[in-house]
Amino acid sequence: MSSLDEDEEDFEMLDTENLQFMGKKMFGKQAGEDESDDFAIGGSTPTNKLKFYPYSNNKLTRSTGTLNLSLSNTALSEANSKFLGKIEEEEEEEEEGKDEESVDSRIKRWSPFHENESVTTPITKRSAEKTNSPISLKQWNQRWFPKNDARTENTSSSSSYSVAKPNQSAFTSSGLVSKMSMDTSLYPAKLRIPETPVKKSPLVEGRDHKHVHLSSSKNASSSLSVSPLNFVEDNNLQEDLLFSDSPSSKALPSIHVPTIDSSPLSEAKYHAHDRHNNQTNILSPTNSLVTNSSPQTLHSNKFKKIKRARNSVILKNRELTNSLQQFKDDLYGTDENFPPPIIISSHHSTRKNPQPYQFRGRYDNDTDEEISTPTRRKSIIGATSQTHRESRPLSLSSAIVTNTTSAETHSISSTDSSPLNSKRRLISSNKLSANPDSHLFEKFTNVHSIGKGQFSTVYQVTFAQTNKKYAIKAIKPNKYNSLKRILLEIKILNEVTNQITMDQEGKEYIIDYISSWKFQNSYYIMTELCENGNLDGFLQEQVIAKKKRLEDWRIWKIIVELSLALRFIHDSCHIVHLDLKPANVMITFEGNLKLGDFGMATHLPLEDKSFENEGDREYIAPEIISDCTYDYKADIFSLGLMIVEIAANVVLPDNGNAWHKLRSGDLSDAGRLSSTDIHSESLFSDITKVDTNDLFDFERDNISGNSNNAGTSTVHNNSNINNPNMNNGNDNNNVNTAATKNRLILHKSSKIPAWVPKFLIDGESLERIVRWMIEPNYERRPTANQILQTEECLYVEMTRNAGAIIQEDDFGPKPKFFI
């Protein structure tokens, strides 16, 4: 065929395609086409050549041509494209003369994309197919793009739903959380050592601890095995704190300490000590030990010498033994009758203007002992010479409240004339002034922290003159704890301690107030020290840590002692506590309870209508929050929640649904308050464990007269508690099981003495009195006196022989009228 004929055929083909295109445009779209096909190019004639058409307004012309370019490039290697090599193709033989229907069906069956991959241009092995047909492209778009769009919409909707979907667990009421199931790490560890920021010297850590507080360890005994406050702290910590704070201590290693043999002054003092033994107020029992030390040992073990000197201050003032009898007179209104301060004359003094003498504790004695002769005489306030001995005893409060301004007339002993001593005292006083609590080291010994609250810090101290331990609460006013509240607390403590009424019963369950003073911007309240810590620490260490519960007898004793304390402050002092919780209930050496921390307390009726004192939300009464109503019965409500916490071993909530349920009188989340297993580890207890719930149910069923049905009902009711796997059906097996269980209960009941009162084994009396105490309407709650007048409390108070936390077997001691 000639070239002319070929050109004519090509022209006819092009003309045919144009006519088809114009025909579509004139007569409308075919069935199944949309508006996007109006400008489709290419018709149905197979072609593999790039063609340009003179339609400038056709937007798909260039894109279709570009598609033709990519389809015609069959030589492109799969390695050059990360998408081309992943397309799956069907390996089929190409048949000649395949019509348009077969191509469309193949496109419908072809899945060239993997999941989660973007759409790419399909590559086939065909070199000339109807791949640029508008119908094929339309079907291609309809098959794949709607699915991808739908997938994108679903993904976006699900992601937005997951973000906006609330946490469903927030609507689930979990109730009260048992302390048994909680990790012990959630509870704060008891403070065993003082929080001292000073780094200890390695020489101090290697010292011998055999002679530390031998006298105090003899008296350190308790009915409890472990007590937070009875823990004997390492006395070296306070010594390190004060000794290391002084910058002059860095120069101490280079100072030569003269021996006793080479010091004329020490020899004179040593012989003078033998001649005037009855004229001195302080005697050092360790002088003989230090005298026998060699110079090398004395110099290398200087830290040990400080320790010996610390224990060497022993007062021989016999008048101090009578100071406790006259303490109240000396503390309130009799200080002005004291004679003028005594001037201690000293012929060794070389100072022209002696500085005022201050009451010095272990700190001054230790530092002076470090660089001076060990046999020198020490002097503290109240220690007089033979010619100036006074017959009036020295009061405890006057020694404590002594300030630097009021002691200007006292003289310093002769050994304080050293320039280095004066420099050390000046530097140390500047450092101590930075922390007001540091002045306690000058007035007391063995000072260490035993607790820290939101507004205060509590220290345990020892008064050197009487060797008696006290607790000092340091409070610094701030915007959350005003000065007015601090002064009110001191006033209330003073009033409660000195309250003289006809009925003094219950006063022994209130913390004893000793003294108070102000130093710089802080206030200090001195009270008696309860060696066994507080009730909260006892519950954590002796109950929760051992995975057990208190028996009902001790719980009733706690109710009795705290009710006695509340009745005294309510009826005799007209004071409401408003912050009753286990952390504010102290435990004495004998195991009795004492109510302390009157920081939220106030007098009733209120004088200030704007008064707003709220304790912890876990124990606060509902009327205080809702109506700002303050009544004595708010303390009764707090006592009731304390018993719920102690008896059920649960953590009281501070908000939420469980919080509101407790304030509506609902105890369903707490479970049974009476212990279902009252067997204890006491030496007087039998090996057999007694389930008081089964015993009470058995007695109740016998009274009903229908032992079989009632026995079956009893087993059914208690199946969740005693035997969760028991079948709850009503067949003969259950009747036999109930009879067997009743016989077992009879065997167990024989282990319970006949004199045991019913309220200790019925499982209902404790819950009944707790519901009475947490009555939502405060007017229906009992008073402290009404609680004490119940039969249960009268029996407990009449028969108990020990403190509230002391175990007295499972059911308490046997009453004397049964003996």
From Swiss-Prot:
Modified after translation how?
A: Ubiquitinated by the SCF(MET30) complex, leading to its degradation by the proteasome. Phosphorylated progressively by CLA4, CLB2-CDC28 and CDC5. CLA4-dependent phosphorylation occurs in late S phase, followed by phosphorylation by CLB2-CDC28 in early G2, when the levels of mitotic CLB2 increases. This phosphorylation is critical for triggering subsequent SWE1-CDC5 interaction and CDC5-dependent phosphorylation. The resulting cumulative hyperphosphorylation down-regulates SWE1 by targeting it for ubiquitin-mediated degradation. This stepwise phosphorylation is thought to be a mechanism to integrate the different checkpoint requirements before entry into mitosis.
Q: Has the keyword Kinase been applied to this entry?
A: yes
Q: What is the effect of changing residue 324 to S?
A: Prevents degradation
Instruction: Kindly provide the name given to this protein in its UniProt entry.
Output: Mitosis inhibitor protein kinase SWE1
* Consequence of substituting residue 327 to S: Prevents degradation
- Effect seen on changing residue 806 to T/A/N: Prevents degradation
Q: Which GO terms describe its biological process?
A: cell division; G2/M transition of mitotic cell cycle; meiotic cell cycle; mitotic morphogenesis checkpoint signaling; negative regulation of G2/M transition of mitotic cell cycle; negative regulation of G2/MI transition of meiotic cell cycle; negative regulation of mitotic spindle pole body separation; positive regulation of sphingolipid biosynthetic process
Catalytic activity, EC:
2.7.11.1
Residue ranges of domain Protein kinase in the record: 444-794
Covalent cross-link (Glycyl lysine isopeptide (Lys-Gly) (interchain with G-Cter in ubiquitin)), residues: 741
The annotated consequence of residue 328 to E reads: Prevents degradation
Cite the residue spans of the region called Disordered: 86-105, 117-168, 278-297, 341-395, 707-736
| Swiss-Prot/TrEMBL induction comment | Expressed periodically during the cell cycle, with a peak in late G1. Transcriptional repression requires ZDS1. Protein accumulation is also periodic, peaking during S/G2 and declining prior to and during nuclear division of the unperturbed cell cycle. Stabilized during a checkpoint response in G2. Induced during meiosis. Induced by ethanol (at protein level).
What reaction does this catalyse? L-seryl-[protein] + ATP = O-phospho-L-seryl-[protein] + ADP + H(+); L-threonyl-[protein] + ATP = O-phospho-L-threonyl-[protein] + ADP + H(+)
Q: Which residues carry this modification: Phosphothreonine?
A: 45, 74, 121, 124, 131, 196, 280, 367, 373, 384, 629, 688, 692
Q: Which residues form the signal peptide?
A: none
**What is this enzyme's class at the first EC digit?**
transferase
Tell me what organism the protein belongs to. Answer: Saccharomyces cerevisiae (strain ATCC 204508 / S288c) (Baker's yeast)
Q: What is the lineage of its organism?
A: Eukaryota, Fungi, Dikarya, Ascomycota, Saccharomycotina
Q: CDD domains from the xrefs?
A: PTKc_Wee1_fungi
Q: Where ATP is bound, by residue?
A: 450-458, 473
Positions with a binding annotation for Mg(2+): 584, 597
User: Gene encoding it?
Assistant: SWE1
